[in-house]
């Protein structure tokens, strides 16, 4: 999973 500084790995969503 690749996201920014705020990334919910549990929900697999990008903020």
From Swiss-Prot:
It is found in: Secreted. It is an enzyme of class 3 (hydrolase). Its main location: secreted. Signal peptide: none annotated. Its EC number is 3.4.21.-. GO terms for cellular component: extracellular region. GO terms for biological process: proteolysis. It comes from the Eukaryota. Glycosylated. Expressed by the venom gland. GO terms for molecular function: serine-type peptidase activity; toxin activity. Belongs to the peptidase S1 family. Snake venom subfamily. Snake venom serine protease that may act in the hemostasis system of the prey. This is Snake venom serine protease. It comes from Bothrops fonsecai.
